[in-house]
Swiss-Prot record:
<dbReference type="GO" id="GO:0030234">
    <property type="term" value="F:enzyme regulator activity"/>
</dbReference>
<comment type="similarity">
    <text>Belongs to the LpoB family.</text>
</comment>
<feature type="signal peptide">
    <location>
        <begin position="1"/>
        <end position="17"/>
    </location>
</feature>
<keyword id="KW-0449">Lipoprotein</keyword>
<feature type="region of interest" description="Disordered">
    <location>
        <begin position="23"/>
        <end position="57"/>
    </location>
</feature>
<feature type="lipid moiety-binding region" description="S-diacylglycerol cysteine">
    <location>
        <position position="18"/>
    </location>
</feature>
<feature type="lipid moiety-binding region" description="N-palmitoyl cysteine">
    <location>
        <position position="18"/>
    </location>
</feature>
<keyword id="KW-0472">Membrane</keyword>
<dbReference type="GO" id="GO:0031241">
    <property type="term" value="C:periplasmic side of cell outer membrane"/>
</dbReference>
<dbReference type="InterPro" id="IPR014094">
    <property type="entry name" value="LpoB"/>
</dbReference>
<comment type="subunit">
    <text>Interacts with PBP1b.</text>
</comment>
<keyword id="KW-0998">Cell outer membrane</keyword>
<keyword id="KW-0564">Palmitate</keyword>
<feature type="compositionally biased region" description="Pro residues">
    <location>
        <begin position="29"/>
        <end position="57"/>
    </location>
</feature>
<protein>
    <recommendedName>
        <fullName>Penicillin-binding protein activator LpoB</fullName>
    </recommendedName>
</protein>
<comment type="function">
    <text>Regulator of peptidoglycan synthesis that is essential for the function of penicillin-binding protein 1B (PBP1b).</text>
</comment>
<dbReference type="GO" id="GO:0009252">
    <property type="term" value="P:peptidoglycan biosynthetic process"/>
</dbReference>
Length: 197
């Protein structure tokens, strides 16, 4: 009888598909589906980002400083009331236009144009730098105002200050010069003219 029971149990086990070997509560897993090789998909190339151009800085307008200063210097040298040999402080040329001008050598051209005449004795750049340093200003500091220029002129014992500005539209700038008496701050001569571009 034991043989018979074992035979029945074995047959039942074979017929049930071996589900009896699994622990309780588990279900047999599905056989894996057959895999097919994946076809490579075409990846679209990304479009490059839109690059906005960097704006160019405004162009500096070049200036013929010597040609611009010449007529005004002629007027200045013939101005009445200026004693020959007077000490003159030339303030740096100020750009007060609505744009950028090549101002790098403007003050130097102005000093050079005035240096050779006997009407004025120029304050040297070394004296000017030393006076600026004693007042706590940088050597390349542009004074920017008439009162600062007169204060500096007193420091170097100058009798006159030449204050020069370029103003107006950068496409057609105007040059203005003022000769001031240091003692009183009075403008004793002024002249205006176009800037030669």
């Amino acid at each position: 009888m034991i043989k018979r029971m074992s035979g029945i149990a074995l047959a039942a086990l074979l017929l049930s598909g071996c589900q009896g070997l699994l622990p309780r509560g588990e279900t047999p897993s599905q056989p894996p589906a057959p895999t097919t090789p994946a076809k490579p998909s075409v990846v679209p190339t990304p479009t490059p980002p839109v690059v906005t151009p960097v704006p160019q800085p405004p162009k500096m307008t070049s200036v013929d400083w010597q040609g611009s200063f010449a007529p005004l210097i002629d007027q200045l040298l013939s101005a009445p009331g200026v004693e020959a040999g007077s000490i003159l402080l030339v303030d740096g040329v100020q750009n007060k236009t609505n744009g950028q001008l090549s101002m790098a050598n403007a003050s130097e051209v102005l000093r050079s144009a005035l240096a050779g005449n006997p009407r004025f004795q120029m304050v040297s750049t070394a004296q000017l730098a030393q006076a600026k340093q004693s007042l706590g200003l940088a050597a390349n500091d542009s004074l920017g105002s008439r009162s600062k220029a007169i204060g500096l002129a007193r420091q170097v014992s100058a009798q006159y200050v030449l204050y020069t500005t370029v103003s107006g539209n950068v496409q057609a700038p105007r040059l203005a010069m003022q000769l001031m008496l240091v003692q009183s701050g009075e403008i004793i001569w002024s002249g205006k003219g176009p800037v030669a571009l």
